[in-house]
UniProtKB/Swiss-Prot annotation:
Protein name: Phosphoserine aminotransferase
Keywords: Amino-acid biosynthesis, Aminotransferase, Cytoplasm, Pyridoxal phosphate, Pyridoxine biosynthesis, Serine biosynthesis, Transferase
Single GO term (MF): O-phospho-L-serine:2-oxoglutarate aminotransferase activity
InterPro entries: Aminotrans_V_dom, Aminotrans_V_PyrdxlP_BS, Pser_aminoTfrase, PyrdxlP-dep_Trfase, PyrdxlP-dep_Trfase_major, PyrdxlP-dep_Trfase_small
Cross-referenced NCBIfam families: PRK05355.1, serC_1
EC number from the UniProt entry: 2.6.1.52
Sequence similarity: Belongs to the class-V pyridoxal-phosphate-dependent aminotransferase family. SerC subfamily.
Protein encoded by which gene: serC
Pfam family membership, one: Aminotran_5
Length: 360
C-alpha cells in the first residue's frame, strides 16, 4: 500500500513516474538495456539527456543567456563550488541568511574568501522571516549575493526577488524549484539538489549565466568548474545517468500537469489548507511570519511537546509518514512538494484535528 510521504528529501515522487521507471527498468524503449546500463555517450542516453535539458528549459523559461548543467555533490557541495567558480579576483561575497542552509553556505564560503553578512532573518524564535531588500546591507563590490529562496528546515520562503543590477544573484533553490514560475533572468546562478521536486538523489542542477563562466579560482577542481562542465554538455565525467533519466520523467510529468502555473495553484491550495488548520488551533503553532511561510516545508509544534511521539505514532498508523521535524529545531515538519497530492494534505489535516480533540 502506498502511503502519504511528507519527507523533506529524498521526498515523495509522482506515482506515474515510478510506474514508468518500473516498466522501463529492464528494457528502455526496445533497446534491450536498462538506463543504468547505458553508456553516457551512447545515442540512447544522449536522447534522454537532451530531452531532459530541453524540457527543463521549457518549463522554467530559461533564457538563451543561461546554461543548464547537471553535476554531482548536492547542494552542500555547491556551497564550496559556487565561491570557487564566482569569486575570481574579488574576495567578498554577500549573504542574506534566512535559515540553516544559507548559514551553512555563509560558513563554507569563509574557506575561499571573506563573506559578508548582508542581512539575517534570525529572531529570538529562530529563523522566522525573510528580510526585504531595504534591509540588505550590501558591501561595496561583492562578487555575488547569495540567497536561499526556500529554507527546508526553518520553513522560510523568499518570494520577492530584487533586481541587483550588475551584481549576480546566486540562489539555492533546492527545495522549491519547479513549484512555481520563476524569472530566471534575474539570477546569475540557480542551484539545487534533485531530491525534492526534481527527482531522486544523485544529480545536482546548476543554471548559470554564460558571462559568469570565466571567474573560477585556480584551485577549483576541473570536475566542478562550470566552464568545463558547460563546454562538455555536462558529460565531462560520467554523469549520474539514472538520476538524470528520472529527472527527465518528472519534467515530462510536470508538463502533463499543465506546467508550473498549474502546479503553483495546487501548491497554494495545499499550503493554505495546512496553515489554516495550524492557525485556527491553539494546539499547533507555526512561528514563521505569514509573508515568509514556505509552501513546500511547513514546520509546526505541538502545544504539549511531551505528546510528540504519540503524534508521530498515530500518524504512521494512518499512513502519514516522515513528519518528524529536523533535529536542529524539533517539532514536526510536513514537506508538501509537488508530488504530495491534495488528498495527502487533507488526510494530514483530518488527523491533526482528531489528535487535538483526543487531547483536549
Amino acid at each position: 500500500m502506498r502511503v502519504f510521504n511528507f519527507s523533506a528529501g529524498p521526498a515523495a515522487m509522482p506515482e506515474e513516474v515510478l510506474r514508468q521507471a518500473a516498466d522501463e527498468m529492464l528494457d528502455w524503449h526496445g533497446s534491450g538495456m536498462s538506463v543504468m546500463e547505458m553508456s553516457h555517450r551512447g545515442k540512447e542516453f544522449m536522447s534522454i539527456h537532451e530531452a531532459a535539458l530541453t524540457d527543463l528549459r521549457d518549463l522554467l523559461g530559461v533564457p538563451a543567456s543561461h546554461r543548464i548543467l547537471f553535476l554531482q555533490g548536492g547542494g552542500i557541495a555547491e556551497n564550496a563550488i559556487v565561491p570557487m567558480n564566482l569569486l575570481g579576483s574579488r574576495k567578498t561575497a554577500d549573504f542574506v541568511v534566512t535559515g540553516s542552509w544559507s548559514q551553512k553556505s555563509f560558513t563554507e564560503a569563509k574557506k575561499y574568501g571573506t563573506p559578508h553578512l548582508a542581512a539575517t532573518g534570525k529572531t529570538e524564535d529562530g529563523y522566522t522571516r525573510a528580510p526585504v531588500r531595504a534591509e540588505w546591507q550590501l558591501s561595496d563590490d561583492p562578487a555575488y549575493v547569495h540567497l536561499c529562496t526556500n529554507e527546508t528546515i526553518d520553513g522560510v520562503e523568499t518570494f520577492e526577488i530584487p533586481d541587483l543590477g550588475d551584481v549576480p544573484l546566486v540562489a539555492d533553490v533546492s527545495s522549491h524549484i519547479l513549484s512555481r514560475p520563476m524569472d530566471v533572468a534575474k539570477y546569475g546562478v540557480l542551484f539545487g539538489g534533485a531530491q525534492k521536486n526534481i527527482g531522486m538523489a544523485g544529480v545536482t542542477l546548476v543554471i548559470v549565466r554564460e558571462d559568469l563562466l570565466d571567474r573560477a579560482l585556480s584551485i577549483c577542481p576541473s570536475a566542478f568548474e562550470w566552464k568545463t562542465i558547460a563546454a562538455n554538455n555536462s558529460l565531462y565525467n560520467t554523469p549520474p545517468t539514472y538520476a538524470i533519466y528520472i529527472a527527465g520523467l518528472v519534467f515530462q510529468w510536470l508538463k502533463r500537469q499543465g506546467g508550473l502555473e498549474a502546479i503553483e495553484a495546487r501548491n497554494i491550495e495545499k499550503a493554505k489548507l495546512l496553515y489554516d488548520t495550524i492557525d485556527s488551533s491553539s494546539f499547533y503553532l507555526n512561528k514563521v511570519e505569514p509573508a515568509a511561510r514556505s509552501r513546500m516545508n511547513v514546520p509546526f509544534f505541538l502545544a504539549d511537546e511531551t505528546r510528540n511521539e504519540d503524534f508521530l505514532a498515530g500518524a504512521k498508523a494512518r499512513g502519514l509518514l516522515q513528519l518528524k521535524g529536523h533535529k536542529s529545531v524539533g517539532g514536526m515538519r510536513a514537506s508538501i512538494y509537488n508530488a504530495v497530492p491534495l488528498e495527502g494534505v487533507k488526510a494530514l489535516v483530518e488527523y491533526m484535528k482528531d489528535f487535538e480533540q483526543r487531547g483536549a
